[in-house]
């Protein structure tokens, strides 16, 4: 197995990171030409190698968990960091799912024959080299690597220091699997050892790295957007909203809100704000607040919701602007009462991170208006925000959920990791 090269003595962090990026650039060339069969063989080899290395992976992850617990990391964030044997098996299964997906490379996006007989084809081709910066999610190391490989790209990874032991082993396993099928190990590299200074060098590796994708909290994403000279796709801080309309199926609404908030409260597609129509304030709102409280959710309530909570004997605290803007990463939610779907949309427009918003209503006029008026990557109708996920969308794993409008939006699967090239097919054609 070829391990990622160690920084030579006397080499600066910037020089070391740029050297990694150059090796990735070289490795991207054979990947660009690799057949689907070769890439799929690599992914199956990676899945097999991950399963074979389960004990090593879990042991390394235990080191990360111990450090996190000693540092006071919250239980929800520790859960995101955790890799037990069952989760390792799930990671391997996800790799095989990506192998089974269609290869986007070579897909004809559109084509035509001009009046002069010249034939045009626009084809999907790999980006080249991806740089992905992410936090404390070791499964992302594998997800990103296999999506990059399947779409014909090399990738330079920078995972959070909280998961460094896990990521080191996972990258070693992936690199060894690549070599076993004749692909260059440098198609997947890591700059974790270089810390925050390494991130700075990666962000400015223009000409070597073709696309940067940050995955993590607002501070990380904004640093990448602010400092990068490499093109960036901004991914999702998830301040997701659920609006419960007067026409909603109320039993269904309680279940959806609970799922959106409590099933995995630390992830970016968890709901952070629920807005309830004022016609439901007297009867439904106390029921919803009680259900949230019984699920362990801390309530940040506007004046109407606060009064309803106190009348029902439930603890709640006054909501602040910081709460409306927050991605809580835990069992907390902001609650507000609005007079119409228009008011709900106005609230969302002010506070959203443009990730995912849901409307719960049976009135089609309400759902149609909400879908047309809300400007977010994903809009859900009578469904949980938790469905915003590459796997749930049938895209396989995802590199991230883009909340910007160029070049991709929403969950980023294989197609979103390609660009296009035009082929102009002639027979001695010259322009007159």
Curated annotation (Swiss-Prot):
Its EC number is 1.2.1.41. It holds the Pfam family Aldedh. It is found in: Cytoplasm. Pathway: Amino-acid biosynthesis; L-proline biosynthesis; L-glutamate 5-semialdehyde from L-glutamate: step 2/2. It comes from the Bacteria. It catalyses: L-glutamate 5-semialdehyde + phosphate + NADP(+) = L-glutamyl 5-phosphate + NADPH + H(+). Gene3D superfamilies: Aldehyde Dehydrogenase, Chain A, domain 1 (3.40.605.10), Aldehyde Dehydrogenase, Chain A, domain 2 (3.40.309.10). Belongs to the gamma-glutamyl phosphate reductase family. Catalyzes the NADPH-dependent reduction of L-glutamate 5-phosphate into L-glutamate 5-semialdehyde and phosphate. The product spontaneously undergoes cyclization to form 1-pyrroline-5-carboxylate. This is Gamma-glutamyl phosphate reductase. It comes from Kineococcus radiotolerans (strain ATCC BAA-149 / DSM 14245 / SRS30216).
